[in-house]
Design a protein with these regions (language model features):
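Residues that scaffold the ATP/ADP-binding catalytic core of kinase and kinase-like folds
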Residues: 9-11, 45, 54, 115-116
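Residues at secondary-structure transition points
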Residues: 16, 33, 60, 85, ...
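PIN-domain endoribonuclease scaffold, especially VapC-family toxins
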Residues: 24-29, 33-81
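Short, well-structured N-terminal submotif of metal-dependent ribonuclease cores
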Residues: 1-34
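Short amphipathic alpha-helical segments and helix-helix/interface helices
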Residues: 21-22, 66, 94-95
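Alpha-helix capping/helix-boundary segments
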Residues: 6-7, 38, 111-112
């Protein structure tokens, strides 16, 4: 699983830190789980002026980013609230889904990464894209 910032790094910014995730996804070693709420958040963020400017430079519209999301992410049902709570309410949906599926969660959000130990106790690895190994 990847949060919205990592989605942007993967699909728009082509950040080299996401390369291992991209390769694992392409080779079907992993599956990218997401929800409609996560897709909706991405769509909203793509409307931010700074992101729109980056899309213009990359000659990529929001529709193209969303199309890539739709072809790579598997939409699943929203997860119930996990037993751990993130300081940032916007990140809770990622925590909940990762806990339900005992998944690796890639993020660069401090509010998520500071939960590493608590999440590991629930069989969830929270880490940066740079640290990802399939």
């Amino acid at each position: 699983m990847i949060d919205t910032n990592i989605v942007l790094d993967l699909l728009l910014f082509k950040d080299p830190a996401t390369q291992a995730f991209k390769q694992a996804l392409a080779s079907a070693k992993i599956q990218w789980l997401s929800t409609q709420a996560m897709r909706d958040e991405l769509e909203r963020v793509l409307g931010y002026p700074k992101i729109m400017a980056r899309m213009a430079v990359a000659e990529m519209g929001a529709d193209k980013v969303l199309q890539q999301f739709d072809t790579q992410a598997l939409l699943v049902d929203v997860a119930p609230k996990a037993s751990v709570t993130c300081r940032d309410p916007d990140d809770q949906k990622f925590i909940d889904l990762a806990v339900l599926h005992k998944a690796t969660l890639l993020s660069k959000d401090r509010a998520v990464l500071c939960m590493k130990k608590r999440l590991l106790a629930l069989s969830v690895r929270a880490q940066t894209a740079m640290d990802f190994e399939p």
